[in-house]
Design a protein with these regions (language model features):
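Central beta-strand plus flanking loop segment that forms part of the substrate or channel wall
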Residues: 16-21, 57-59, 187-201
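Short beta-to-alpha linker loops that shape the active-site pocket of alpha/beta-hydrolase fold enzymes
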Residues: 5-7, 92, 125
Length: 201
């Protein structure tokens, strides 16, 4: 794993750490379920405190189209073993008394959703990876990829004025806001783009 700076030095340290499993498509639902299940075991496996709390989540719909959307998402989540319950407005009010429910057309409750400490989750994942033989190199920037016959063949890197190349047949592009640019360099479209967000102290 090549990390251009230090692990968690990007936006990870101030992320909300929300663990939600209600997603818009099949693959994202499967990934969210896998991640939530993994995060509940990480602390025991690595000894790194993750702050994982399964406090549950509520999703509400105020329009008919949103109602159909969350009910479809709930059905898909259920098919993958995610615990999700459609609840009445009365049950919604009991779970969250501050919420005005008069205009709510549908609500779902996911009791295994929750929150974690994103920086510590990343460190626990890194420790678990190292325990399983992964080598992590910090302060190493990926500068390019080579391909041969339509497949990746090597990764070029730069670190503190030194450069190098790693021969490989597989690359996982985890470059965050630079993933699109890195993919484009070898003709791969990565459907990501950077967007502004806010953090209030």
């Amino acid at each position: 794993l090549l990390e251009r700076k230090k692990l968690t030095s990007g936006t990870t340290w101030h992320a909300a750490g929300l663990i939600g499993q209600l997603r818009a498509n099949l693959n994202m639902t499967r990934l969210a379920k896998y991640s939530a299940d993994l995060y509940t075991k990480l602390e025991a496996e690595t000894g790194v405190a993750t702050g994982m709390r399964q406090s549950g989540s509520l999703t509400v719909a105020l329009t008919d189209s949103r109602k159909q959307e969350i009910l479809r998402q709930a059905s898909m989540a259920r098919a993958f073993g995610v615990e999700v319950n459609e609840i009445t407005n009365k049950e919604l009010k009991e779970k969250y008394p501050l919420l005005s429910v008069e205009d709510v057309k549908a609500a779902v409750h996911l009791p295994k959703d929750g929150q974690c400490d994103p920086a510590n989750i990343a460190m626990a994942l890194a420790k678990g990876a190292r325990q399983n033989g992964v080598k992590i190199f910090e302060d190493v920037k990926v500068t390019g990829l080579d391909t041969h016959n339509g497949r990746v063949s090597s990764v070029h890197w730069e670190s503190n004025g030194e450069t190098g190349m790693i021969s490989t047949e597989i690359v996982a592009n985890c470059a965050g806001m630079w993933a699109r640019e890195l993919g484009n360099s070898v003709g791969v479209t990565v459907p990501l783009h950077a967007c502004e967000h806010f953090y209030i102290l």
